[in-house]
Amino acid sequence: MTTTNKDGPFRQQYLPGVHKEPNLAISESTHSSDWYSATSSEDCFQAASQSFSSQKSNGNVITQQPGKLHCEISDPKSCSFVPAISTDNAQMGTSGIIKYRSYSNPDLLVAMSPLAYRDEAPQSQKSVANSRQDLTQTSCEVVTVSETVVNADSITTTTVTSSTTTTATASQEDFIMVEAEQDETAGLCDATMPLVDKKNITTSSTTSSPSRQITPRIENGLSFENVVSLVKIFPAFVNKLLKKPWYASRCDEVCQFPKAELAYYDIVSTDVDDEHFVIVAGKVTTDEHLMDNQFHLVFAPVGFSEDVSLDERPFSLFRATDKKDLMDLLHLCDEKSFLFTSLDMSTMRADILRSKIEELVIQIRLKPHYHMIHVAIATDRLDFFSDGMIKTMNETLEPFESQLRCLCHTENCYPVHLALTMDRQKIVERLLELDPTLFCETDKAGNNVWHHVNSSFCAQIIWDRCPASQHFIDERNMDGQSPLNEAVSTAKPLVATFLIGKGAKFTRGDRNELFVAMTSKNAQSVVEVVLTDKPEIANERDALGNSAIHVALYKESLNALLNRKVELGLDIDVKNNAGETALLLFITTRKPDLLPLLVTLYAHGANMNATDPHGNTALHKSAALVDAKKISLECVKFLISAGSNPNKINLRGESPRHLAASLQNQEMLAILKAAGATRCPKGYKGCRSNCRHDCSSAEDEYEETLQKIRIGNESDYEKTEFTASEKLNIQDTLDGSRRGKKAKVNLISMDGGGIRGLVIIQTLIAIEERLGDDIFKYFDWSAGTSTGSLIMAGLATGKSLREMQQTYLLLKDRVFDGIMPPYDTVQLEKFIQDQFGTGTVWEIPYPRLMISAVNSEKLPVRLEMARNYKPAKDVAPETPKEMPLWMALRRSTAAPVLFKPSEDRYIDGGIISNNPALDLMSEVHAYNRELQLSGRKSDAVQMNVLVSFGTGQIPSTVIETLSIDSNSPLQSIKTIKNLAAMFIDQATASEGAPVARSRQWADSLEIPFFRFSAPLSKNIFLSSTSDLDVCTMMWDSFIYCRKHRDYIDELVKVLKHDTDHPHVKTPFTDL
């Protein structure tokens, strides 16, 4: 006979996602009446009596003591099932005890005395959910047929016989779910189970808890969940059968080590001293277990050991066959280890824990430049911002206040802006509690919180909880976009609706006239007119503290403004409210004319190593932005060529190389390594293999990088190397075998070449860095032609090499500013006077100068030299004492076609002496002979070294034909053109034969000879105004000097060997 009640038949119901069948779980909201088959003890007794005989025949009767509730449990470690008791399967024992057995799980038997039920009936109607104390009054007895006693406080094993009972009084904690043990093979079990009210469980129920779907069991058959579990277990079974690895096939999928596998791995030695993060490798191979040939990056909560408990097993974060691939990630994870160790592993479900760890690893790999707080926001770790976590970080890590203002380099914003952009609503609320002033700050591009907000929810809570931020609702960013403009342009309709509802406008009002002109193309004339009419507005600032220099978008307008910076009292390195100079701001904001803007700023004297409040230079910002294609590599090359320090570190101890290595940008890394960027110091955390201290030596690394950089076809260029006789001359000089009573003088010669004079300057800068001192004071006699004379005069008048570099960048825009030659001669003369003054040549006391020019008044043309000393009487007449220096320079730079002749007769000295090295040596020889003939041989000087500087070697070109054919006029024209180019090339030659002659003459005198002339990747015309061409030429020269450091070092040895240099007094005697 079967008895049913209103709760339906007795069934076992379990939760989806749990593949292992547990046997008993009591819900927090379960009524005690739900565990009985009827509403009265009489019903219970009757039902039991009617089924007693059939139960007895099956041999399943267990003798119980009256007044106790008994449960027979076969596997107490598994507890997903929620039993609903029915009288359908109630059975009566010999002692009058009712026992209930499940349809689907015959191992589960619930037995209770009807007398006990009658005694407890009134109290049993109370809900456990309302008061757990009700259930604590009931004494329960568990018959442990399977030798295990289950208690929610603890699980203990007790060996008993079938007649032995263990009695325990239920406590409040007895009525919770018992956590299911995870299956090691499949790894698919949920770590925790929610509490379920039995009354909400029916055969047709679709929900049992807010987050889980309950699937009814099919009577006398497999449930859907059993089928799912079998499907999930099947691949693991096949893998084990086929001896496939236990971990996932994807190398970046986080997997927890099965306990049985821990014994087969050993820890690999690394430079990271943190037991939580280790690299392990397989160590043994057996018939049953093949050795794992992959390295595993492991997160071990309590260390990597086979003795750990199931809940503390390590996680394999990443796998690779090459240990080096894991080292970078190891250092990154170690730097952010707090994010892993702070996870609440004791209460978190296993699948959720794995998911959170995997999300951390993904973010760290994708965003290696992120600091800890940025990763916490990206992974939505609200617990990171809790009071306990903050206290721990303040005591053991970087202060939390410092982290809140830690700049995110690629996004160029702060954590609060990142949280708004990613719409981390809970984190935003927490930040409002911690420090509302964060929401009044702008990022480096001038965006405030209203620009970043991505949901109306965040917008509303900011509006309500931070009233101060309401004042910025119409503030524009660096691009002139208001928050409402931004919301509309980025398709955020709900945010746009919110802003409009709060009174936001599309525009805040125009800036002053100068600001408008600075953002307009080809508006240089407008800038000049505005400054002439209202010079006072040149120093005005906008709401973000930006000056007119900061907002410039085009080179022409910026040049027009900075040309009057001295007159207007402008500071080119002035900082805005964010603490950034115009240079730093240009790097981080996408300017349409970035490279020309950078060149213009440097030409006018901008500090290339200026820092923001975080200590970041332009190179730091570039290293973070190159990967995002926000800045070109040409800009980076220019910054380095212009003096940006590749080894400067910011306030966090990060160098540009560290940031580039974090992003694994190989091109950027190659540039920095070629520039001499060093690795991070030993012990610095978060380094990847390209910046860690434990790798190859610096010199080997530099050489390897430089060897890979090729400029043109090497066979086209003369090599910078010593001949055997030159090595001997240098050795004799350093050994002192050429000692004598004569004063030794160092000679320097500079070729002509227009704008390519930048090659000479870049080379001199490299030598000066190795010398560690002002190089020009080590030379006693100098000669220069055309652009070489400008450099020589600038250094002689006290300019530094960097100032001369800036002068040349100004020259190309001010002097070569026409569409085509001839260029404005008046502008050239004015520029020379502005840069070198109006003093005379004779006012420069030292060193001796020779400035070449060609007098073209009659044929044959004559080479004339402007000097600041009296030459030998048979060489040339004395230069007039009143000759201005600018006039001598004007004569020497009067390149035919490009400029009108000076005084209608003087043209560029390069026509005859484009490489004045031979003329310089001739001048010294004539001086000594004059003294010898006048009986003052002891006053003669001895040449100590000759250094010749060229303006770069251009790539070779093929001459098609040199034959003139009267039957082919076109060919004849080509021939004439080729002959003209050849004649001009040889007339102005500074490479080839002139260098060979100088080298041989110096060798005959046993004088060390050095020749510097960088190979250029393209032919740069001497009047080129292209910023890209100029920057390429500067970089080619920079790389040339880096490749020939040994050659430069030999020159430095020779210059420093003579203790008389620099001379305290002149070694020369008047003739």
UniProtKB/Swiss-Prot annotation:
The active site is at residues 786, 908. It comes from the Eukaryota. Its EC number is 3.1.1.4. GO terms for cellular component: cytoplasm. The keyword Hydrolase applies. Disruption phenotype: Mutant animals generate fewer progeny and slower larval development. GO terms for molecular function: actin filament binding; calcium-independent phospholipase A2 activity. A motif (GXGXXG) lies at residues 752-757. Keywords: ANK repeat, Hydrolase, Lipid degradation, Lipid metabolism, Repeat. Residues 1-22 are annotated as: Disordered. Transmembrane segments: none annotated. It catalyses: a 1,2-diacyl-sn-glycero-3-phosphocholine + H2O = a 1-acyl-sn-glycero-3-phosphocholine + a fatty acid + H(+). It is an enzyme of class 3 (hydrolase). ANK repeats lie at residues 411-440, 479-508, 510-539, 544-570, 578-610, 614-651, 652-681. Pfam families: Ank (PF00023), Patatin (PF01734). A motif (GXSXG) lies at residues 784-788. Phospholipase that plays a critical role during oogenesis, ovulation, and/or embryogenesis. Belongs to the patatin family. This is Intracellular phospholipase A2. It comes from Caenorhabditis elegans. The lineage of its organism: Eukaryota, Metazoa, Ecdysozoa, Nematoda, Chromadorea.
